[in-house]
């Protein structure tokens, strides 16, 4: 597994699967039982695949991406996550073949008003 393989998989997720709604590409990027730490989705692909197919697309902008060993961290601006703009950080663990085997995320709605002039992105 190389950093380029990992970046390629992540670009496919955000550009083609989320932004373009090509959910059928996801199984080719994932291996094993796919451990999911988001409490809204079960382990395995069925939950996230169903969500993507129902949503049709999940418009987003990748702001930052970092890779450390077998982990990748992606700071994302979700333009319409459940009806609202949302800041997210996705963490993916890859196996030796460059396939995703585990996922964590944190999501925070972007507030209409902030107590500082800093953006979330």
Where do the language-model regions lie?
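C-terminal and inter-domain tail/linker signature
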Residues: 1-121
């Amino acid at each position: 597994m190389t950093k380029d393989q990992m970046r390629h998989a992540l670009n496919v997720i955000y550009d083609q699967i989320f932004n373009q709604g090509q959910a059928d590409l996801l199984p080719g990027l994932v291996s094993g039982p796919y451990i999911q730490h988001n409490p809204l989705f079960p382990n395995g692909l069925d939950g996230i695949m169903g969500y993507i197919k129902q949503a049709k697309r999940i418009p987003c902008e990748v702001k930052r991406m970092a890779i450390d060993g077998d982990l990748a961290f992606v700071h994302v601006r979700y333009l319409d996550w459940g009806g609202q703009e949302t800041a997210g950080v996705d963490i993916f663990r890859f196996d030796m073949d460059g396939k995703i085997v585990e996922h964590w995320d944190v999501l925070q709605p972007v507030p209409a008003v902030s107590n500082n002039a800093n953006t979330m992105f």
